[in-house]
Amino acid sequence: MNIIEIENLTYSYPAAETPILQNITLQVEKGDFLAIVGNNGCGKSTFCKTLNGLIPHFITGDFSGKVVVDGVNTLEADVGTLAQKAGYVYQDFENQIVRPTVLDDASYACLNYAMADYVERGKEALALCGLEGRENDYIWQLSGGQTHLLALAGAVSLRPEVLILDEPIAQLDPGHADRIYQVLKELNEKHGKTIIVIEHHTEYIADYCKHVMLMRDGNIAWKLPTSQALRRVGELQECNIFPPQVTLAADKLRRQGRLPWEQPLPTTIPQGLEAFRGLSLIHI
């Protein structure tokens, strides 16, 4: 079952000479964990903003084609309705924090929808995002990673089936980055949420994502299972996307004749340990 269906999507910003998105057609299955990669300016963030209706309802321009998210045509619904279909955590997530305490902020969206159970929804979202017990804390008491989780909780409180995160670990240390992705993994695997991340940290993509979509010049170059995608070393590097270090090491060994060409490149550490078993790596 597809949770997202896009047909012939083309979009241009006002006064732009050329479209930033060009004739995109895509299906995303319910329960997928999709990473979107590509170089700067290829249209990743613009594309994702069509999924929650910011484009074209809030950000105007020339829009054509069809975008359906969880059964709703984005052209036929307002952004308030679409926020309950596709939650979005932006790269500048601090701007999504608007209330002084943790529970106030997590439940604020539901309060604005006049939901009678807004407090319960906020508490539920905080628990799902690993912030249970922090309800009465002030937001300034949170770390950067916890603040990011709070922004995610605000989106989760509306119970959308799709969650979109733009560069979720760009400002975080490895410990908090791991925590963010563990929360996303649980939301995906235990609660059936479809997760879409704009990401360039390919080690995290390898460990957590099910599919990878490469965007280039406003088009989708391909969408592939993660292992297949990350093995396209040269193509990714052309787009300034660096495959996992274990993949790059194996690719170099293969070019040196020390790994067979028919052996698939490893994309995770466990795969690398198996691939490199018995090799002397002194000369890598």
Regions found by a protein language model. Give the residues of each.
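ABC ATPase NBD Q-loop/coupling interface
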Residues: 66-81
